[in-house]
């Protein structure tokens, strides 16, 4: 399958400028859905999708028919990972649990998109409870490979061009990794920069709302709607100094991925970027263990009542997580939660002392694994999630014919500059 171009910025310009109508654009996206969904399975089935989307697009047109200035996402079709509650649609969170057991008020992030004029194209496939048990989604670049997870459907739907923007979430690596596998841009903002209310939780101390677009310009447009108190830089920031973490961390990636990463660093040097090697994350093993304990323990707490009532409907991988979480001592959970800030401070101190503006690292250990029973390893994304720092994943070539990416992480709260830099970095990669 050949991925299809459908960048957010072009859609926004055409819709707000009157070159396309929401009804016509929605029809185009629905035609793309009809063309690819039987192969990719990025969206959840919805019996009356076409009628609902047409009605919603018509309502947006009517509401703004006489408006001189259209809302920022006027008529833009969007996808929403099926852990986000949406009024009028069930939430299953990739599970076999009854929707009424998971029901809740509409997610703030969904409301932000709809208030900005977006049209919901549909819910996207997620692994069970945003953990590892996969759904049916396949990688648009090679249908025999995984799209990654847990935001499998959102990444794949953006890659296929079914829609230009989709919400996801990341508790370990569930935005940046599938973005790398599917050859799109993934954004994990600073922790809680996008509110997580109305989202089925896995580990509240690690859960981040994120999203996917086809390019960095689109990622910046979406951030202006989704991120709280967004303040774009008055002037475009200077080229960032790029820091590279320790080999102890980098060596978690495979040899082919590390070669691709070094090639990307060479491209950045050629383009005038200063690259600084550091010993940051040389204690990655303890960071990994701490984060995994925290996720397991919090998942066990969050799912306690549901698991007691519906334990026989949980996938075995999720059962194992919850059972492991029950065994995590309370003191270890407290230490893990405190460790988030410790890591954030350590990374910030290293950036300050070395004069580094962004960290660069492989966005995954390698390209998408073959098969769809395994969504890949999130280990390269884990420390940035644990620290809660803003991270953007950018496409950076291919390995073995499959997309790979580079992730860039900035200081906590420095989302605005990170996404401004991302547009320049994308042009080099």
Question: Regions from the language model: what does each represent?
Answer:
Residues 105-223, 390-398, 403-405:
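Short glycine/serine-rich loop segments
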Residues 87-100, 160:
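DPxDG-like acidic metal-binding loop motif
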